[in-house]
């Protein structure tokens, strides 16, 4: 120990430059001197000559701070100076991004600002989600990754909370190129308790409007029509004041099953044509067709003329203006009451790509055109979905006005225990 101390004193006295420094600086320089003598490269100064040494690699945190310091200052963002407009190439660059691993990066188009929504966070949202898990129920809101889940489940001052329950499981027998719902030729069997569980959940939530949607079940003889109708009846028994909309499949073209669901006590019968006729073979499953969807909507109206019928079209798939006009004329010809327009948004990279992001003013234009053609109601906007804001005050008022004082008797007629038993036994109601 004494020998080491003596060596340090000798080393210190050998450099007169160190003795002239203030005491506080000496330990640092002394340590630097020791490090320089520990290397194999000779140095001409106590601190060492760095001309022959490799550059020092900065720690990630230090490099990040240096990058921030070299970036724009706060004044660059609050300056009152008006910037020059971007040229088309620069504007496009702001809407694209490179994603993927090094060497395999792909350029993708970023979402425009009008398609961005807040993160869901409300007591009503959390309560509905917990009940769904407890009763083993599914919603198309979650399965289809709907961007409006916070708005619909949370409700607002202008409309009641709306939930879309997905019946008959979470697996569809069809594989449409726009849809993110799971697909299989042999999905799990139906849950016999689902109608009761759905009615129980809805009676707890106190919703003003509920949408029941179904996966396609081509593996079932009736396509699941009786299961759907039984669920509607059970809901009306437990919560007679709730308004029920059914967003159904085409039941493989079986119009008797369409009539069965239409007469089950629901308030709105919805079936989506999804896109214009020319694009249907490229967008929907091969077992679906535009003309078959028209027949389904027409049969529902024929089975119950006072029933509101509804359909939806996605924009941004490559449709033309003339094709949209033709689709609307075909829908009005069969007395469809409500139509909605929404932007197609690609769920995953495995699904068909977006052809274009349609501007909000174009959606407003198609809403005006639809209303001028005689549709009872039209919801149109980038974030509108077939069941989005289905419980809007306008539709609720129309339904209540149509029912008037006979609402109770109509519901009682189709929701008696006797009719439920007949339905389960396979007897269609007439």
UniProtKB/Swiss-Prot annotation:
Subcellular location: Mitochondrion
Organelle targeting peptide span: 1-37
GO molecular function, one term: metal ion binding
EC code: 2.8.1.8
Cofactor binding description: Binds 2 [4Fe-4S] clusters per subunit. One cluster is coordinated with 3 cysteines and an exchangeable S-adenosyl-L-methionine.
SMART domains in the record: Elp3
Comp. bias (Polar residues): 39-55
Pathway membership: Protein modification; protein lipoylation via endogenous pathway; protein N(6)-(lipoyl)lysine from octanoyl-[acyl-carrier-protein]: step 2/2
Pfam families, per database record: LIAS_N, Radical_SAM
Region (Disordered): 39-59
Cofactor(s) demanded: [4Fe-4S] cluster
Binding site for [4Fe-4S] cluster 1: 141, 146, 152, 387
Keyword annotations from UniProtKB, A to Z: 4Fe-4S, Iron, Iron-sulfur, Metal-binding, Mitochondrion, S-adenosyl-L-methionine, Transferase, Transit peptide
Entries under Gene3D superfamilies matching the protein: Aldolase class I
Positions contributing to [4Fe-4S] cluster 2 binding: 172, 176, 179
Annotated catalysed reactions: [[Fe-S] cluster scaffold protein carrying a second [4Fe-4S](2+) cluster] + N(6)-octanoyl-L-lysyl-[protein] + 2 oxidized [2Fe-2S]-[ferredoxin] + 2 S-adenosyl-L-methionine + 4 H(+) = [[Fe-S] cluster scaffold protein] + N(6)-[(R)-dihydrolipoyl]-L-lysyl-[protein] + 4 Fe(3+) + 2 hydrogen sulfide + 2 5'-deoxyadenosine + 2 L-methionine + 2 reduced [2Fe-2S]-[ferredoxin]
Family: Belongs to the radical SAM superfamily. Lipoyl synthase family.
Name of the featured protein: Lipoyl synthase, mitochondrial
Protein species of origin: Ajellomyces capsulatus (strain H143)
């Amino acid at each position: 120990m004494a020998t080491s101390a003596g060596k340090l004193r000798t080393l210190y006295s050998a450099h007169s430059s160190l003795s002239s420094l203030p005491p506080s600086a000496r330990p640092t320089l002394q340590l630097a001197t020791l490090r320089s003598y520990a290397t194999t490269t000779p140095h001409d100064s106590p601190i060492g000559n760095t001309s022959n040494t490799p550059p020092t690699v900065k720690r990630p945190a230090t490099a990040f701070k240096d990058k921030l310091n070299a970036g724009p200052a706060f004044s660059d963002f609050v300056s009152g100076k008006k910037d020059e407009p971007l040229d088309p190439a620069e504007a496009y660059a702001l809407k694209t991004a490179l994603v993927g691993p090094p060497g395999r990066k792909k350029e993708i188009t970023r979402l425009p600002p009008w398609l961005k929504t807040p993160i869901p966070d409300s007591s009503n949202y959390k309560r509905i989600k917990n009940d769904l898990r407890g009763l083993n129920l599914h919603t198309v809101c979650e399965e289809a990754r709907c961007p409006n889940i916070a708005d619909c489940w949370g409700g607002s001052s202008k409309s009641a909370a709306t939930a879309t329950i997905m019946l008959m499981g979470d697996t569809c027998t069809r594989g449409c190129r726009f849809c993110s719902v799971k697909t299989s030729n042999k999905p799990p069997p139906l849950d016999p308790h689902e109608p009761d569980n759905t009615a129980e959940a809805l009676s707890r939530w106190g919703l003003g409007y509920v949408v029941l949607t179904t996966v396609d079940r081509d593996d079932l003889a009736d396509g699941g029509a009786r299961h759907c109708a039984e669920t509607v009846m059970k809901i009306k028994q437990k919560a007679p004041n709730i308004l029920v909309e059914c967003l159904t499949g085409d039941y493989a073209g079986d119009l008797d099953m369409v009539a069965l669901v239409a007469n089950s006590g629901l308030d709105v019968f919805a079936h989506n044509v999804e896109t214009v006729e020319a694009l249907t073979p490229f967008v929907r499953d091969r077992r679906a067709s535009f003309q078959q969807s028209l027949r389904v909507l027409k049969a529902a109206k024929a089975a119950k003329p006072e029933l509101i019928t509804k359909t939806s079209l996605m924009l941004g798939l490559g449709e033309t203006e003339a094709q949209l006009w033709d689709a609307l004329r075909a829908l009005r010809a069969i007395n469809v009451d409500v139509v909605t327009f929404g932007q197609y948004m690609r769920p995953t990279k495995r699904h068909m790509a977006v052809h274009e992001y349609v501007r909000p003013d174009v959606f407003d234009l198609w809403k005006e055109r639809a209303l001028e053609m005689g549709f009872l109601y039209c919801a149109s906007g980038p974030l509108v979905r077939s069941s989005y804001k289905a419980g809007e005050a306008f539709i609720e008022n129309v339904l209540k006005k149509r029912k008037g004082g006979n609402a109770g008797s109509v519901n009682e007629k189709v929701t008696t225990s006797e009719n439920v038993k007949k339905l389960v036994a396979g007897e269609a109601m007439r």
